[in-house]
Structures are given as C-alpha cells and as structure tokens.
C-alpha cells in the first residue's frame, strides 16, 4: 500500500512522508507540475483576453472603477507591476459583479462577472482546458484561508475559515513563504482533481488577525446561518473589507 502524505516515510527516517521522500519523488512530469506549466500559459493568455473584452465592453474607465471598488478609494493609482494587482486582477476579472447598465456592448442579461459574460459570448473561442479553467475561476469566490501545514516548494494544507473546508493547495511560490497559522485572502479553484490559487492578497495575515475573520464569520452566520459558496459571492464586499 502506498504511503499517505501524513504517514511515516517508508524510508525509515521517522519523518512524515510529505516532509521526506514525497517531495523528492515528485518529478517535473507529475500531474501537479504538468498542470502548473500549462496553467501559467493559460492564465496569462486568458487574463489578457478578458481585459481586452472588458475594456471594449465596459469602457476605458473600467479599470479605475474596479480599483476604486476594490480599495474603497480613488486615490490608489493602478500599477500592473505592483503587489496589489496580485489580488485586484483576479477579483476584477472573475469575481467582481458588474451591473447590467454598465455594459456598453456584449453584456449579459443579468448581473455577472467579466469572465461569466465572456463565457456566455465567446466560449467557442476557447479550447476545452481554457474553458474548464475559466469556469473554475467563475465558480469559486475569494475567502480567507489559514495555513495548517507547509511542504516547501510543493503546497500547503489549508482551512477555509469561513466555509470550514480543508484543502491541500498545490502552490510552489507561496509554500516557500507562508508559515503555519498565517492566513491569506485567496481565490482557490479546483481543476483536474487539484486545488490551486488563482489569486491571492499580497500581504499574509498573522494569527492575531484571525479574530477579525472570526467576527466576520459570526456576522455571516447570523445573517445566513450557513456560510456557503453562494453566500460568499453575495457578501463579497463584506469579506473583502475585513
């Protein structure tokens, strides 16, 4: 029987398998590595295509309006190379709900995101993998995730604090920087049986900051009883403003 990630390593080191030979056995051709390489190319290409679609369909001031809503102020200049774009970009394209009246052309019949409107109008332009990726990004809202364990260079065991779900997120760069008990505001999607970050806030939160998220959770439960994916979409502004 193959060793589980949390089982003692078969090599006899006494260390958990995921901290020992698991990482060594991961090759550039394993599913996560192959998916990562494919995703990097698809993500950049789709982001450019969605941005072109948004500017054409919503007007040139779309970026300014999105930034104002995201930061709650109009005083933050947009700099695509800034760390803040790490969270703003994915939220703007995949999660920000656009009123029907804002669309100049190619708009949906009801409120929706840029990505969902693009899928309605131009899904036929996408290959199957790109379409699945875009659909996964549309389905998932941003939430707060607490790091429970880290396998550097491979991924993180994380808990969605608001929905109470645990996931192993395949993530190379963040797994080298984040520590257990830190929290991130992130956009975790499910694709090809893996969980991946499609977007993340630029600054990790420390354990002391969790109290504010617990207060948010209590407020959400008071309003909705059960915190679901649909609730997080509906309460995006409150979650983002925490």
Predicted region positions:
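Acidic/negatively charged segments and metal-coordination signatures
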Residues: 1-157, 161-242
